[in-house]
Amino acid sequence: MAKFEAHLKCSFCGKAQDQVRKLIAGPGVYICDECIDLCNEILDEELIDNPTHQRNGHEQSRKAKAATTTAKPAPTLASIPKPIEIKKFLDAQVVGQEPAKKILSVAVYNHYKRLAWKGDGSGETDLTATKLQKSNILLIGPTGCGKTLLAQTLAEMLDVPFAVADATTLTEAGYVGEDVENILLRLLQKADMDVDLAQRGIIYIDEIDKIARKSENPSITRDVSGEGVQQALLKMLEGTVANVPPQGGRKHPYGDSIQIDTSQILFICGGAFVGLDDVVEKRLGKNSIGFIQNENRTRTKSNRDRVGADLINDLEPDDLVKYGLIPEFIGRMPVSAILEPLNAKALESILTEPRDALVKQFRTLLSMDNVELSFDEDAVEAIAQEAYKRKTGARALRGIVEEIMLDLMYSLPSQTKIKNFNVTKKMVDESTGGKVVPLLSNEKRIVKESA
């Protein structure tokens, strides 16, 4: 085998493997790094001869589409909802998290006031000469507590494009994975390729804690999916004119691109930050106050109660630096909000109270089959308790309800005599199929008998 490898050579220039830095194998052929560089030079020369061919084609199609679409006007001070109005809208969709909703309401209101502000730094008075800087938002809280939902609800109320990105898929430019500019492409697509509209949108970057570097100290090796991504995001978060490939993928110096100014885009970053409590605990020299219960560690009830409220006061930027975020990144996220873990009572409210609550969703689904669905209070409580045990927050609720409703939703559409159905605690506890039978005409609800 070693003798065979010694005779490997480039299929294009004929140089042996030991004469080049890299030899890449294909189906029966090999190409060296020098030939790859030569191919790139040839392609670059051809693009230089006609660099605007593809660019102009895309620009013309984009302008043609924009001409047929009514552009949304930029926000005015009068049209921006006040913080109290924003929080009221959030209350209709998100249960609990009062401090976080208040922080978000003020931050979003100030951000869109900034967009409506005419001051450009050239005015004659102190106020008109003031340039307002952008304040991005960092959300910290356990999984399933409503971080993404809060961002989605804000975008819905403000009627602006909204895009979600997963930080774990991002890598530093030049490495396998997504470039940070692809985040802007998603926002642009949500805005139907309207650049002006996209520049007023909201981007939510989830799992931001997963790009923390492994230690507080800078690494001597390249961390392309951790610190490298943080560095790549800095200019975008602060505000820059980014060149976005309209078809996604990697940027090319002579390829087609769309310019987007990120200075008016609101970035909201969220993450669970598992283990951040240990960092705070170490600094304070007190018992742990973290999000995740540890069976090997004794925690008092007062410790657990402090998680939501007191961590807001206890957490400092230096804790995030020790966790693995670089200081420059933290500096570009000046507004932070801590979201509390959801207890069983909050999960009960999530099932029934919000506008798009799960119970309302399933009632709507069955109403299409002319069946009125209801849930006993103890059934709702049992569902919430089971979701709380699974430790995945509100995300567990849908899975549990789907399990309970599977056989019901399978059989009810074919049974035209059934007009009402009630979900009981027994059904939740058993979470089994069972036979659906109609009640007599003088009974109001349908009961479920175990098979």
Curated annotation (Swiss-Prot):
| Residue positions binding ATP | P142, T143, G144, C145, G146, K147, T148, L149
Q: Which PROSITE patterns match?
A: CLPX_ZB
Annotated GO molecular function terms are:
ATP binding; ATP hydrolysis activity; ATP-dependent protein folding chaperone; protein dimerization activity; unfolded protein binding; zinc ion binding
Q: Which residues form the ClpX-type ZB domain?
A: 1-51
State the residue spans of region: Disordered.
50-73
Could you list this entry's UniProt keywords, alphabetically sorted.
Answer: ATP-binding, Chaperone, Metal-binding, Nucleotide-binding, Zinc
Q: Which GO terms describe its biological process?
A: cell division; proteolysis involved in protein catabolic process
Keyword Ribosomal protein found: no
List, alphabetically, the CDD domains matched: RecA-like_ClpX (cd19497)
Gene3D superfamilies cross-referenced by the UniProt entry: 1.10.8.60, ClpX chaperone, C4-type zinc finger domain, P-loop containing nucleotide triphosphate hydrolases
Family, per entry: Belongs to the ClpX chaperone family.
Q: Assembly and partners?
A: Component of the ClpX-ClpP complex. Forms a hexameric ring that, in the presence of ATP, binds to fourteen ClpP subunits assembled into a disk-like structure with a central cavity, resembling the structure of eukaryotic proteasomes.
Q: What NCBIfam families does the annotation carry?
A: clpX, PRK05342.1
Listed name of the protein: ATP-dependent Clp protease ATP-binding subunit ClpX
Give the source species.
Prochlorococcus marinus (strain NATL2A)
Q: Which gene encodes it?
A: clpX
